[in-house]
């Protein structure tokens, strides 16, 4: 396993009064504006670099700031990055390949001066400021690459320092070239040194002439002192670290170099993302090359990008996360999350207690349904779960039939589109996972409702809803048994108790929904469930409401009606009142 930062706990940093998060090789922070996503990223950066923070970076200046981190995957290879002295200093604190440490800073109330410390956990107690640990962490994790939301793009792209974002990316890109040509480059650089250094074999005669002239003046004051001009040649590292970008625009005659500030933010952002994509490409092609431990932070990678480019950037970031880089992004775009990674995305929100990083879908699956976690992970992966994280409420529906037309029906009946930031419709493959997925989504702080066929009642009666519906279900069971015994209703399953509902087929449930003596009780159950966030079709299933089944011509007729403002949907949907009631319930 590649060494990585596995988790952080943040206290009193900016908007983060107290929150924690589990980090993965690819971690996405999602949430509305000003929720504190960028503050979590900055807290992680501060944990690693230990720069001095000001009082404006503190939630409550009367209390210390603390960010605790856990590094996992430390091996002998990792320790080889350290000096022997630092290896000895850090070794007592590494437990099963894990290092737990915390960076703290507090302000003296009287003087206002800041006091910093780096504490390390030895398995039983915290040790304050043990020597060598800060340097060891810096060697394990090179300085992170941070691409903010375009605030310093122009200045950053024109600087000639490896401390800039582009400088760091360029350094990572050319590292393979540097290793490949190091001997050749170093030889050529040393040749230049022979002409310019104070003791060069082929020192320029003009430099000797200057030395002679200057020494005549110096010797007038100090006869035993002499000087020689010396121009140090840059090392190969220094040359590559000074790399920058020149931007050219095509013209009829020849390309013209222009300052990057003359280009729009879209072009600037595209250049940054292009470098990230190319870095991912070469790392994927050179799978045998040494993996990096560098962290990459990007605020809103989707910013200024064309929708078709967002998916490409996402895949590049995932590739980097599989090549040793640890990638942490903040995003407002569901396109930045594949279904595979949505379950591990961290929803960030803010309330009166500051910024909170909620537990992920994966964490809640393990917490609530550990025994069936593989099936639930699959269920979330197969649904469009990346979109639900950006909504205030989720409507879970059974199967994709409903989602195919519900958005269009909503617009047709209500006269306006369903706002995806308010409500997201998520299709679930079969009714068996509806309750479990609902509980998990509710557990991560998103309100959830359910739409299902009437046969979902067999699942409902196995939950706490059974007590809620006890009177209505007793009445239904009594009416059902009477109708069966009298021969008025014929079912394929013998019904004597609530438990026997589990064996009733969907076709038989439709019969029950439309039978004169049981219909009233189905409507009572429907209303009570509706008031509690579950909508079951009173007619049995959605096909019964539409009035048709699977024929493509019938669906085409409905879709044609939904797309044509002049056509009345009442003429197409058999039980329009029931459909309208559901749409208004949304």
UniProtKB/Swiss-Prot annotation:
It catalyses: Exonucleolytic cleavage in the 5'- to 3'-direction to yield nucleoside 5'-phosphates. Changing residue 543 to A: No longer kills recB-recC deleted host cells. Residues 164-270 are annotated as: Dimerization domain. Its EC number is 3.1.11.3. Changing residue 306 to A: No longer kills recB-recC deleted host cells. Gene3D superfamilies: P-loop containing nucleotide triphosphate hydrolases. Optimum pH is 7.2-8.8. Residues 393-586 are annotated as: Toprim domain. ATP binds at residues 34-38. Residues 271-390 are annotated as: ATPase domain C-terminus. A divalent metal cation 2 binds at residues 402, 541, 543. Its cofactor is Mg(2+). Residues 1-163 are annotated as: ATPase domain N-terminus. The keyword DNA repair does not apply. The active site is at residue 570. Changing residue 332 to A: No longer kills recB-recC deleted host cells. GO terms for molecular function: ATP binding; exonuclease activity; metal ion binding. Keywords: ATP-binding, Exonuclease, Hydrolase, Metal-binding, Nuclease, Nucleotide-binding. It is an enzyme of class 3 (hydrolase). Belongs to the class 1 OLD nuclease family. An exonuclease that acts preferentially on linear dsDNA, processively degrading it from 5'-3', releasing 5'-phosphomononucleotides. Initiates on 5'-phosphate and 5'-hydroxyl ends. Also acts on linear ssDNA, nicked DNA and RNA. ATP enhances but is not necessary for exonuclease activity; has ATPase activity that is not stimulated by DNA. The old protein kills E.coli recB and recC mutants and interferes with phage lambda growth. Both the exonuclease and ATPase activities are required in vivo. Probably interferes with lambda phage by degrading its linear DNA. This is Old nuclease. It comes from Escherichia phage P2 (Bacteriophage P2). The lineage of its organism: Viruses, Duplodnaviria, Heunggongvirae, Uroviricota, Caudoviricetes. The gene is old.
């Amino acid at each position: 396993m590649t060494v990585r930062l596995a988790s952080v706990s943040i206290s009193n940093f900016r908007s983060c009064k107290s929150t924690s998060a589990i980090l993965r090789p690819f971690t996405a922070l999602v949430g509305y504006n000003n929720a504190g996503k960028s503050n979590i990223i900055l807290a992680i950066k501060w944990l690693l670099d230990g720069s001095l923070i000001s009082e404006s970076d503190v939630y409550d200046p009367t209390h210390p700031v603390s960010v605790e981190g856990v590094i996992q995957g430390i091996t002998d290879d990792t320790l080889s990055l350290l000096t022997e002295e630092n290896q000895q200093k850090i070794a007592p604190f590494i437990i099963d390949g894990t290092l737990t440490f915390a960076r703290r800073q507090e302000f003296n109330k009287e003087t206002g001066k800041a006091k910093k410390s780096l504490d390390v956990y030895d398995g039983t107690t915290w040790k304050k400021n043990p020597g060598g640990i800060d340097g060891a962490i810096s060697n394990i994790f090179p300085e992170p690459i941070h691409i903010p939301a375009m605030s310093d793009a122009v200045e950053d792209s024109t600087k000639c320092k490896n401390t800039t974002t582009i400088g760091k990316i360029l350094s990572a890109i050319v590292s393979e070239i540097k290793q490949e040509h190091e001997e050749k480059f170093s030889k050529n650089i040393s040749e230049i040194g022979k002409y310019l250094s104070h003791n060069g074999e082929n020192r320029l005669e003009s430099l000797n002439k200057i030395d002679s002239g200057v020494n005549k003046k110096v010797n007038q004051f100090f006869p035993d002192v002499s000087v020689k001009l010396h121009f140090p040649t840059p090392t190969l590292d220094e040359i590559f670290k000074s790399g920058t970008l020149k931007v050219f625009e095509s013209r009829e005659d020849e390309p013209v170099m222009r300052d990057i500030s003359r280009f729009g933010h879209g072009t600037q952002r595209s250049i940054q993302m292009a470098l990230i994509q190319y870095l991912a490409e070469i790392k994927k092609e050179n799978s045998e090359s040494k993996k990096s431990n560098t962290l990459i932070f990007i605020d809103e990678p989707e910013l200024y990008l064309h929708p078709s480019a967002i998916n490409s950037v996402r895949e590049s970031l995932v590739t980097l996360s599989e090549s040793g880089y640890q990638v942490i992004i903040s995003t407002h775009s569901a396109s930045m999350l594949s279904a595979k990674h949505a379950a591990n995305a961290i929803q960030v929100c803010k309330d009166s207690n500051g910024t909170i990083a909620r537990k992920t879908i994966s964490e809640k699956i393990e917490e609530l349904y550990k025994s069936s976690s593989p099936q639930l992970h699959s269920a979330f992966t197969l649904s469009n779960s990346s979109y639900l994280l950006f909504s205030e409420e989720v409507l879970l529906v059974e199967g994709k039939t409903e989602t195919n037309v519900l958005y269009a029906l909503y617009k047709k009946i209500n006269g306006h589109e369903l706002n995806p930031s308010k409500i997201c419709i998520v299709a679930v493959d079969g009714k068996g996972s509806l309750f479990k997925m609902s509980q998990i989504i509710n557990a991560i702080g998103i309100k959830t409702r359910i739409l299902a066929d009437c046969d979902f009642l067999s699942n409902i009666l196995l939950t706490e809803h059974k007590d809620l519906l006890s009177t209505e279900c007793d009445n239904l069971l009594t009416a059902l048994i009477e109708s069966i015994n009298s021969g008025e209703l014929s079912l394929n399953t013998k019904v004597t108790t609530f438990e026997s509902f589990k064996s009733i087929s969907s076709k038989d449930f439709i019969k029950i929904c439309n039978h004169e003596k049981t219909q009233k009780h189905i409507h009572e159950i429907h209303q009570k469930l509706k008031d509690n966030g579950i909508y079951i079709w009173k007619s049995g299933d959605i096909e019964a409401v539409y009035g048709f089944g699977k024929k493509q011509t019938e669906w085409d007729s409905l879709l044609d009606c939904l797309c044509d403002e002049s056509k009345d949907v009442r003429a197409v949907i058999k039980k329009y009142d029931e459909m309208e009631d559901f749409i208004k319930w949304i």
